[in-house]
Amino acid sequence: MSPIVRRNFAAAVFAIVLGVCASGCGLFKTQTPESPTGGGGELAPNFSLPESTLATMQRSLNKRNTTNFILCLADTLLDFREFHATFDPSDLTQFAQSGRIPPADWITKNEQTFLPQFLTYNTNGFYDLYFSLDTDRGGITDYGGATQKKVYNLHYRVWAVGSPVAAGSAGLTFERIGANSDYKVTFWEDHRDTADVRTWGTARLNGR
């Protein structure tokens, strides 16, 4: 099956999963939350599907559980693969114009250092992370192969008590890796999709 055919098939499946998750876990909502959602118990990490890994990311950020969030990313020690992230060219240009030097690469240990600082950017409430398909960038493409590679192009929105923390579009590559063949994020291609709110990539560059 070609990547294009896989993409169409995966998008159809995703639409079904999206409907289930939207009604059950709120994963793909994009509206401003009415109030902080800090209540409820912690869910165990689940990496059986890309959607469950996304749900783990969402839940972990809301609960300020940086350990579980980082587990969603590939790690050389645990998975024998490294996570990498890239930045929107406009974010890199803006950062360089401020007289600072952008990092040559962004890997798991960088995200591990950054994430606690990201969570202090707005200390007034819990963070809510929402995803929705970015069809302009291709939606979902299923490349298959030994690692059952899938690329999800998603708009993301991070809110804290009704205030935006970060917004953008991410091309997230999921692959089955490690001893348990878990679906982890191996690559994050960050893009701007709004002029009014900083991207996750800009937050990474600024360290919070």
Task: For the regions a language model picked out, list residue spans one by one.
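Bacterial N-terminal signal peptides that target proteins for export
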Residues: S2-F14
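C-terminal motif of bacterial Sec signal peptides marking the signal peptidase cleavage site
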Residues: V20-G24
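Short, low-complexity N-terminal intrinsically disordered segments enriched in polar/charged residues
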Residues: C25-K63, L71
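Short beta-strand edge/turn micro-motifs at domain boundaries
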Residues: G26-E42, K149-R208
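Acidic/histidine-rich, surface-exposed loop or edge segments in extracytoplasmic proteins
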Residues: Q31-G41, E51-L54, R81-R100
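Sec-exported extracytoplasmic/periplasmic mature domains
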Residues: R59-N62, A74-L78, P116-N124
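Short, well-ordered alpha-helical segments enriched in acidic and aromatic residues
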Residues: N65-S90
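Surface-exposed, charged secondary-structure patches
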Residues: L92-V165
